[in-house]
Amino acid sequence: PPHRTIMGVVTRSAEKSYPATIESRIARTYPNWALSVVGEGSRLRMMEHIINAYSEADSRIQPEEISEKERISDRILKGRLGEFVSFLSLECYLAPEAMSSVITRFQECPDLDFLYADEDMVRENGEFLDPFFKPCWSPDLLIGMNYVGRFNVMRKQLLLDIGADWGDIANDGFYHLVLRVAEETNKIGRVPQVLSHCHITDESSDITAGQSELDVTAQMKSLQDALNRRGESADVVRDGAGKIKVHYRVSRNPLVSIIIPTKDRWDMLRQCIKSVESVTRYPSYEI
């Protein structure tokens, strides 16, 4: 079977949560894998006893300590990579069938470059909740949110083509990298199975509850950089609820034709026209 490299990334939320053992993240139904646990020195040392124990028991598991002046992306590209490269946040773990399901999909669709899968959340007591059944590839939705999530798999060649300029994935939750993937290829697919489970605490309502302000700022910068690269005239902002949104700037006022298909219902037509005239602030429209 094809060799697959899993990059387990130590993030801030992994530090303050309770990552399960490295063993629980490795799907046992697919044999040909290697796991690199990647993180900045101080983060990695918080999990040192866990990583070393499994590294001594299985040589396929290796820690990759990153210096403060080194980017994770540079270290990953310098390392030995399998035919497929997978990124997994260490507050998540894989379903037992995850790797075999992904490789099977790549074999069924050999033109695909990148795959993502459905996911859910798991509480400290082992309760699974909030499954996220994702749509097929949607570049527009990706601009609104990182719906691809915290587990994905790509061909090594795609990662090499993108290069190292995709930021610190430990901060922005892989968003920068996925946005770069979307600019490099449209051969992107979904595995319609829940293949990863992300830990949340009993106090958290969702996986984003533990995000720091720095994480959100990094995501906003990743999105703004992507819009700039694509030549979009837009600004990334936060709304009153703290959610990230994109405001596209309108440089001209093209004519908008409003079609109302109820000409024989004067009562409805009058109300509709009145609402358009009283509410809209856009100057260039016709009814």
Language-model features and meaning:
Residues G39-M47:
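A conserved acidic beta->alpha catalytic loop
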Residues R80-Y93:
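Short beta-strand-to-loop acidic/aromatic patch adjacent to the donor-nucleotide binding site
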Residues I66-R80:
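Glycine-rich, basic loop-to-helix element that forms the pyrophosphate-binding segment
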Residues E23-N32, E108, K274-S284:
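Short, acidic, metal-binding catalytic loop of nucleotide-sugar glycosyltransferases
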Residues P1-S24, Q224-S278:
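N-proximal low-complexity "stem/linker" segments adjacent to membrane-targeting elements
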